[in-house]
Amino acid sequence: MRISGHEFARMCDATLTGAVATHQEMLEMIKQAKKYHFYSVIGQRCYLDEMVEKLKGTDVLVGAGCSNITGADPAEVKANFAKWHLAHGAQEIENIMNISAFKSGLDDMVVRDVRAVRDAIGPNVVYKCILEVCYLNDDEIRHACELLIEGGVDYVKTSTGKAGPATLHHVEVMSEACKGRAKIKAAGGIRSIETVERMLDLGVERFGVG
């Protein structure tokens, strides 16, 4: 599937959440998001109010993550963070699957975790949840997609990009598992327009860049 630069930008969530990401880098991300019309930005929680203010009146949304990098926060903590973000102007929410619970076979805990955030934000807020596919084999990816769909997500997302890259194979497995019941966001290690176009053919609707 061939797309223009503008079409690709409107599928991109620009992300800047690293531990050493600076305030100046956040301002530059916002500048680039406005210039290229990215779909959304996700930054450090301490700058959320400022990001919301600077993007008022633009076509760029502000997203927010409600989990630490491991996904192992208690469900109530994630739910409260999600509500806090919405109260401060965030328009989309991202969670990270509880990878420890998943690897432990605690499927009910995984679903409760995902569902707690959905219940906290309501049915109309776009909600994404990250698998961290680099930690999972194909069967685990398929099973994780089922649990996240059961928990009420709009998007299953490959990765944070901090643990390892997302590959075409990962996306193919996710696409086969989701069967259109959830949308797919790809992030981490996507370096060429050819890869983007092949991922689009597999059903990816949003990309993380940062």
Where do the protein language model's features map onto the residues?
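Conserved N-terminal beta1-alpha1 strand-loop-helix module at the mouth
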Residues: 1-64, 68-87, 142-143, 147-150
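Hydrophobic faces of well-ordered beta-strands that scaffold small-molecule active sites
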Residues: 8-16, 41-43, 60-67, 93-95, ...
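Alpha-helix-loop-beta-strand connector modules within alpha/beta enzyme cores
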Residues: 45-70, 105-128, 132-133, 150-151, ...
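Catalytic cores of alpha/beta
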Residues: 52, 73-84, 136-147, 169-186, ...
